[in-house]
Design a protein with these regions (language model features):
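Active-site-proximal helix/loop segments of hydrolytic enzymes
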Residues: 2-3, 28, 32-239
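Short glycine-rich His-centered loop
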Residues: 2-27
């Protein structure tokens, strides 16, 4: 039997997440983009024979990161992925990130994720050693260490790494993926144009990491419509 995969569409309902460069026009927030991408990933995984457990399939807030992880554990998933997008007040911030459990030793699926994302975005380094604001090393080390209690400076709703840690503590390997910065015009444009390929790449990464061959569903061929009696061929010459 093929693996059971958990997909968490970040945020939802009253938890909006970050805004995008186009929020003022389309009214969409991170919660909308995570759900859209998660549903496409789910579809691709199901097409390849995998069972999928979703944290949500509509615009609802399914609970804290702890409750989301609990659902994955109750459904005994083999791997869980939390889908997010980044944002920052200065539009220059850009790139993708993949966060993994502190104790994870095998990074096969993560390396595949990076291979997909680097085709479209700059890969950000969470372990970079500097005082730069974007280097999350201190938080990353503390929050993803399964032996460390929850960092109390963060509330349940903002402790996004808590999904990874709580899955890990329940025996589930889980990743958190930040696709790109919705607040960066270039990232946003690239994502919108390539979201289906990105979703496919993520699904393919999971399928292949579990030792299966990814199968692309062939589009159904359209049956030519029979012409009605009064319709003429394009080359018909009227007399």
């Amino acid at each position: 039997m093929k693996a059971k995969i958990g997909i968490d569409a970040g945020h939802g309902g009253s938890s909006l997440g970050t805004y995008s460069v186009n929020t003022a026009q389309d009214g969409l927030f991170e919660k909308d983009f995570t759900l859209e991408l998660a549903l496409i990933i789910e579809e691709k995984l199901i097409e390849n024979g995998f069972e999928v457990v979703m944290s949500r399939r509509s615009d609802i807030n399914p609970g804290t990161v702890f409750e989301r992880a609990k659902k994955m554990a109750e459904n005994e998933v083999d791997f869980a992925l939390s889908v997010h997008f980044n944002g920052f007040e200065k539009e220059g911030a850009n790139g993708s990130e993949v966060f993994v459990p502190y104790g994870e030793k095998i990074g096969e699926v993560e390396e595949r994720f990076y291979g997909v994302l680097e085709k479209y975005f700059r890969i950000r380094e969470p372990f970079a050693r500097s005082s730069n604001f974007f280097d999350r090393n201190a938080i990353f080390d503390k929050k993803l260490n399964r032996k460390t209690k929850r960092f109390e400076a963060f509330s349940d709703e903002k402790d996004y790494f808590g999904f990874i840690r709580n899955c890990w503590e329940k025996g589930i390997s889980a990743d958190l993926i930040e696709i790109c910065f919705l607040t960066n015009p270039s990232d946003f444009s690239v994502y919108v144009k390539n979201k289906n390929e990105i979703a496919k790449g993520i699904a393919k990464s999971i399928v292949e990491a579990f030792g299966e061959k990814y199968k692309e569903k062939k589009p159904k061929e359209k049956t030519p419509r029979k012409k009605l009696p009064f319709e003429k061929d394009a080359f018909h010459v009227l007399e």
